[in-house]
């Protein structure tokens, strides 16, 4: 089965083709970073318009990359949520229209399930086996999920305010870094020195697996403001030191909660996915954690950490092969709880 996957939930337009026998055979991605850079964040209306312009050309490019025609496609998968409603509608409308025109089934895919299963796109020796604990960490979500199979999910904990990626982006903006801020802050943190600044590790002093990053962001803002008041300005080294301290606090918080989740479930496999899973310090810290616990950690390669069509095509092929399909109506869910998804046998 060859499945065309379409991802348009935010500011990346992704189109890919997954073959149940050959694996990923085409992967096309267009990012809107330059479009939104002047605004310091994603502008939903501009994102939707750009998806309209880019999706069809990327579909043609994916077919060409795989040396296929429309007649070779057996099904279409598209992101139906969560995400920006206008952006989601672009991908869903195109997917439903093509499915009708090509007379193939289409299936809606949960964006975060795509991220969760993205490590399955790796080579067999680098894929996790069920069951495992997943840390989904991105600009919009920070969640710990117990995973017992495809669709067999239990939410163990999540952020009660800002997601980790959102806190990265907002703190980067306070430091005057370019958009996208999270990646810029991580690069700057590599130049920082440990010990000059320290930030709290929120909600680690109490039981539970929920997260809170708004207070950490406020602590960073106060530190920046006080330093400017005392010194008159922020040197590049001071910015790097603040970035290092902030990133360390986030990473340590995530590591502490992951350890608790693994102990609570009794599992010894950890998966990290989502845009922030590309963070080098986070990967290193969680690798240390799993080595100490005698377990294994898995994550997608960097190209599959950010939003992409490959993860949508992969999940779509699983659900289409299981007999799932969506109706002709174009239905998107800007807010969609992953635990509502049907489990596959």
Swiss-Prot record:
Binds 1 Fe(2+) ion per subunit. Its main location: cytoplasm. Substrate binds at residues 136-140, 169, 182, 279. Fe cation binds at residues 111, 115, 307. GO terms for cellular component: cytoplasm. GO terms for biological process: tRNA threonylcarbamoyladenosine modification. Pfam families: TsaD. Transmembrane segments: none annotated. It catalyses: L-threonylcarbamoyladenylate + adenosine(37) in tRNA = N(6)-L-threonylcarbamoyladenosine(37) in tRNA + AMP + H(+). Gene3D superfamilies: 3.30.420.40. Belongs to the KAE1 / TsaD family. Required for the formation of a threonylcarbamoyl group on adenosine at position 37 (t(6)A37) in tRNAs that read codons beginning with adenine. Is involved in the transfer of the threonylcarbamoyl moiety of threonylcarbamoyl-AMP (TC-AMP) to the N6 group of A37, together with TsaE and TsaB. TsaD likely plays a direct catalytic role in this reaction. HAMAP family: TsaD (MF_01445). This is tRNA N6-adenosine threonylcarbamoyltransferase. It comes from Actinobacillus succinogenes (strain ATCC 55618 / DSM 22257 / CCUG 43843 / 130Z). The lineage of its organism: Bacteria, Pseudomonadati, Pseudomonadota, Gammaproteobacteria, Pasteurellales.
């Amino acid at each position: 089965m060859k499945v065309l996957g379409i991802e348009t939930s935010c500011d990346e337009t992704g189109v890919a083709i997954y073959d149940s026998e050959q694996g990923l055979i085409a992967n096309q991605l267009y990012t809107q970073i330059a479009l939104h850079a002047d605004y310091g964040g994603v502008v939903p209306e501009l994102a939707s318009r750009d998806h309209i312009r880019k999706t069809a050309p990327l579909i043609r490019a994916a077919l060409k990359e795989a040396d296929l025609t429309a007649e070779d496609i057996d099904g279409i998968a598209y992101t139906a949520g969560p995400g920006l409603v206008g952006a989601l509608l672009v991908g869903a409308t195109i997917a439903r229209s093509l499915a009708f025109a090509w007379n193939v089934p289409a299936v809606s895919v949960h964006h975060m399930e795509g991220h969760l299963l993205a490590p399955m796109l790796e080579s067999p020796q680098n894929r996790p086996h069920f069951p495992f604990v997943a840390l989904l960490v991105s600009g919009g979500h920070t969640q710990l999920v117990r995973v017992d199979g495809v669709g067999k999910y239990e939410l163990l904990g999540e952020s009660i305010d800002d997601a980790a990626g959102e806190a990265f982006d907002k703190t980067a903006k306070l430091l005057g870094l370019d958009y996208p801020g999270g990646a810029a802050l991580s690069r700057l943190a590599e130049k920082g020195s440990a010990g000059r600044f320290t930030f709290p590790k929120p909600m680690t002093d109490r039981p539970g697996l929920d997260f809170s990053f708004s207070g950490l962001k406020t602590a960073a803002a106060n530190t920046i403001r006080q330093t400017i008041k005392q010194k008159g300005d922020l040197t590049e080294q001071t910015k790097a030191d603040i970035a290092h301290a902030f990133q360390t606090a986030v990473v340590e918080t995530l590591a502490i909660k992951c350890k608790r989740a693994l102990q609570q479930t009794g599992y010894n496999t950890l998966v990290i996915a989502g845009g922030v899973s590309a963070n080098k310090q986070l990967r290193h810290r969680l690798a240390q954690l799993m080595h100490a616990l005698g377990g294994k950690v898995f994550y997608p390669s960097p190209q599959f950490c950010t939003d992409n069509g490959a993860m949508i095509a992969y999940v779509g092929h699983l659900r289409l092969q299981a007999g799932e399909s969506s109706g002709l109506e174009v239905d998107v869910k800007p807010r969609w709880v992953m635990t509502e998804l049907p489990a596959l046998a």
